[in-house]
From Swiss-Prot:
Stored PANTHER family: ATP SYNTHASE DELTA/EPSILON CHAIN (PTHR13822), ATP SYNTHASE EPSILON CHAIN, CHLOROPLASTIC (PTHR13822:SF10)
Keywords carried by this UniProt record: ATP synthesis, CF(1), Chloroplast, Hydrogen ion transport, Ion transport, Membrane, Plastid, Thylakoid, Transport
Alphabetical list of InterPro entries matching this protein: ATP_synth_F1_dsu/esu (IPR001469), ATP_synth_F1_dsu/esu_N (IPR020546), ATP_synth_F1_esu_C (IPR020547), ATPsynth_dsu/esu_N (IPR036771)
Taxonomic superkingdom: Eukaryota
Name used for this protein in its record: ATP synthase epsilon chain, chloroplastic
Organism the protein comes from: Calycanthus floridus var. glaucus
Function of the protein: Produces ATP from ADP in the presence of a proton gradient across the membrane.
One Pfam short name: ATP-synt_DE
């Protein structure tokens, strides 16, 4: 038995295919979804979406949004998403270093919040590449 997974951003469809299982980062922690999962709607946090198909795991960096799960259908609408295999490791590492530097230079509450958010996004992209 499989799940139909659709990952969407405002600009494009990132993934639309059958999968065996997913592990999704939500605002209240990670959840695993197998076929016949109870219906839920949940907020998606910045983090890694793990997708299992044919015994292998695919990693995807997702940048927050919403998910609806029910009747073996999963629809995930996120601000942005990238497959780990599509991320340039050197560019991701540079972005992480810039985000860390910007956080250390941030002044005021708003700049600190924005810098922390940019750092979380950058770490997620690096993690999507390096996760085994």
């Amino acid at each position: 038995m499989t799940l139909n997974l659709c990952v969407l951003t405002p600009n494009r469809i990132i993934w639309d295919s059958e999968v065996k299982e997913i592990i999704l980062s939500t605002n209240s922690g990670q959840i695993g979804v197998l076929p016949n999962h109870a219906p839920i709607a949940t907020a998606v946090d910045i983090g890694i979406l793990r997708i299992r198909l044919n015994g292998q795991w695919l990693m995807m960096a997702v940048m927050g949004g919403f998910a609806r799960i029910g009747n073996n259908e999963i629809t995930i609408l996120v601000n942005d998403a990238e497959k780990g295999s599509d991320i340039d490791p050197q560019e991701a590492q540079r972005t992480l270093e810039i985000a860390e530097a910007n956080l250390s230079k941030a002044e005021g509450k708003r700049q600190v919040i924005e810098a922390n958010l940019a750092l979380r996004r950058a770490r997620t992209r690096v993690e999507a590449i390096n996760v085994i």
